[in-house]
Amino acid sequence: MYVQNLPTAWRCGRFLFDWQKRMRPLVMGILNTTPDSFSDGGRFASRDAALRQAEHMITSGVDIIDIGGESTRPGAEAVALEIELERVLPIIEALRDCGTAFSIDTYKPQTMIEALKLGVDCVNDVWALRQPGALAAVHQAGCGVVLMHMQRDPQTMQFNPEYVDVVADVRLFLAERAKEVEASGVSAEQIILDPGFGFGKSLEHNLRMLREFGSFAELGYPVLLGISRKSMLGKISGKEVHERLAPGIAATIMAVEQGAAVVRTHDVPETFDALRLWEAARVL
């Protein structure tokens, strides 16, 4: 076990990921079925393209695939429930028996309910289940839940975000929200925390959270790193969105060294390559 002070395992729907036996983080592959995602908008909007990408990630060894039908990039407009369902449900239905865990990236309770009916294993919510009905949607479902910190909403979150102390403020929110979700009947073993890189944070805020990522891992829950291809990497490297692999891998290893338990990425094979080297050197 490379991360200390965690629950024994992560209960994620049909799957039980035993932290006691793991020597590397889980890899969560991103599958956006949206036309306007900041990174791959439109590439996987068709069913066939999405399924091919999912198969590529599965062949690469992905632990869980995160399927999203609405972009939450800065300034993104909300989409109607019917459109989101049309985008994600056929993909979940086609892939649910392939032996890999699946997550639904949504904040809409009805989307959660419909995805869970089809057997999705995890709900990944940028609103941390704060929308009315979201807690009820996952109550007693036995699914994993990812609780993310976001200041304001996707439309306004990058308009001059401010904190007294970004690390302390995000830590406090995550700790309090996790306990509130537990009080609703979700067990600690189902919960993953996400500090929300790029969601209501300036470049300085993001860099501080990366430098002090270990402070989130001290909260007693597994912590997810979601930094793949994000604008902070472009601001530092000067690279366009599809050229940010190298800084993304560097950030990943920084966070893993501090206890990241899940790495959410667009670049599954390359992330695995980096983690294999990290693991080999660590267990030598």
Locate each region found by the language model.
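Active-site-adjacent loop and "lid" segments of alpha/beta metabolic enzymes
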Residues: 4-14, 22, 39-53, 72-94, ...
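Catalytic domains of carbohydrate-active enzymes, especially glycoside hydrolases
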Residues: 52-68, 258-259
